[in-house]
């Protein structure tokens, strides 16, 4: 499987685990606030053999692997890669944008993934702006249902700036975030999901749309207001960041 970058040691991305992280190159979205812009070109590939060699030397402390990107479900060798990870008795967490429910269904049926984190790009009517394109709406909705069937999972949305018609840029609103929460509850028929509303943090070297590099981070009061409103629909909502 193509790996664009890797981390040997991570205590944040996989709750309760000491994890190695594999970043896959390439993505079918163009989210303006994406922090992984260098991975999107799908050009760099450091290969996976070095990653597995590291796992074999780190058995005493690493007990999980995070596969993120980019978008991992674009990788044709994702399933064999995960099978090799599982052979080492390691837990697997997958980060996804939900655009390939067929891959998620295969992973679910084979019981290959322990934890899935799915990015929800706000309410459906904003997806063309927040995901940078159209055409994935039905797939993303189907993936909401599938992800909620994994052994452990979370949904998450970054309270990020949205580039609107005419080039106006402002943060996703409380109303729009509430609509995203309603979408999750309606698609899955449940409201007991872990849902994280995440702070947007600008950076100078990696955002896909450079206009956001100087945009402020999400105000604490907006995060608090979003949390209060979204919790009416998804009570297990938490602020992250």
Predicted regions and their residues:
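Canonical Radical SAM [4Fe-4S] cluster-binding loop centered on the CxxxCxxC motif
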Residues: 5, 9, 14-49
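Charged phosphate-binding loop/patch that engages nucleotide di/tri-phosphates or the phosphate backbone
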Residues: 219-241
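Glycine-rich phosphate-binding "P-loop"
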Residues: 36-43, 63-71
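Class I S-adenosyl-L-methionine
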Residues: 7, 19-20, 215, 233-234, ...
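Conserved beta-strand termini and adjacent loop/short-helix elements that scaffold enzyme active sites
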Residues: 6, 198-200, 239-241
């Amino acid at each position: 499987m193509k790996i664009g970058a890797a981390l040997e040691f991570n205590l944040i991305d996989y709750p309760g685990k000491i994890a190695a992280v594999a970043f896959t190159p390439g993505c079918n979205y163009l989210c303006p606030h994406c922090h992984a812009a260098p991975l999107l070109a799908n050009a760099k590939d450091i290969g996976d053999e070095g990653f597995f060699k590291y796992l074999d030397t780190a058995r005493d402390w690493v007990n999980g692997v995070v596969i993120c990107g980019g978008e991992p479900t674009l990788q044709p060798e994702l399933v064999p890669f995960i099978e090799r990870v599982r052979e080492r008795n390691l837990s697997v967490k997958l980060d996804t944008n939900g655009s390939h429910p067929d891959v998620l269904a295969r992973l679910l049926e084979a019981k290959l993934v322990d934890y899935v984190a799915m990015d929800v790009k706000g309410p459906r009517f904003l997806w063309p702006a927040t995901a940078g394109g159209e055409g994935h709406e039905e797939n993303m909705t189907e993936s909401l249902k599938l992800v909620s069937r994994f052994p452990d999972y979370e949904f998450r949305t970054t309270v990020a700036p949205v580039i609107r018609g005419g080039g106006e840029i402002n943060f996703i609103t409380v109303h729009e975030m509430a609509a995203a929460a309603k979408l999750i509850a309606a698609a899955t028929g449940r409201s007991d999901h872990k849902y994280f509303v995440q702070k947007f943090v600008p950076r100078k070297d990696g955002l896909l749309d450079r206009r956001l590099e100087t945009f402020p981070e999400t105000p604490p009061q907006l995060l608090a207001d979003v949390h209060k409103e979204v919790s009416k629909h998804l009570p297990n909502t938490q602020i992250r960041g």
